[in-house]
Amino acid sequence: MKITILAVGKLKEKYWKQAIAEYEKRLGPYTKIDIIEVTDEKAPENMSDKEIEQVKEKEGQRILAKIKPQSTVITLEIQGKMLSSEGLAQELNQRMTQGQSDFVFVIGGSNGLHKDVLQRSNYALSFSKMTFPHQMMRVVLIEQVYRAFKIMRGEAYHK
């Protein structure tokens, strides 16, 4: 079992890095977890739609280059399906039962994900209709993955 969080951009703030490191440590007994960062494109404000699409395409190419053919890709999208913590645990457990063992969660850049990445996705997941900073979403995602493993094992973390 392997979980990868594939994200556009780098974590800069120490407090986000510390939170991620804590959950990586907690996930150790359950799964192998990798965090892969791909370079984000410089995206000045007031870009045209064409420029936004070009940024998304370049970031999308970098994302797709990091995904193996056998990986199950779960993209984080505002239009994705909203699940409870139990629902995420059930979704992962069901896919593991079907023999899937390499999961890649994709967090796009500030302009979203390119259509090629969306087409490669096996499942579109949404945490909210709201928009959150990408750094924060990494922490929320890794915490929910940890919570899902605790739920799947029937352990006490989840309340």
Curated annotation (Swiss-Prot):
EC code(s) of this entry: 2.1.1.177
Family matches, as InterPro entries: Alpha/beta_knot_MTases, RlmH-like, tRNA_m1G_MTases_N
GO cellular component terms attached to this protein's record: cytoplasm
Sequence positions that bind S-adenosyl-L-methionine: L76, G108, F127, S128, K129, M130, T131, F132
CDD domains with a match to the protein in the record: RlmH-like (cd18081)
Catalyzed chemical reaction(s): pseudouridine(1915) in 23S rRNA + S-adenosyl-L-methionine = N(3)-methylpseudouridine(1915) in 23S rRNA + S-adenosyl-L-homocysteine + H(+)
Subcellular location: Cytoplasm
Keywords: Cytoplasm, Methyltransferase, rRNA processing, S-adenosyl-L-methionine, Transferase
Main location: cytoplasm
Sequence similarity: Belongs to the RNA methyltransferase RlmH family.
Description of how the protein assembles with itself and partners: Homodimer.
Protein name: Ribosomal RNA large subunit methyltransferase H
Species, as recorded: Staphylococcus aureus (strain MSSA476)
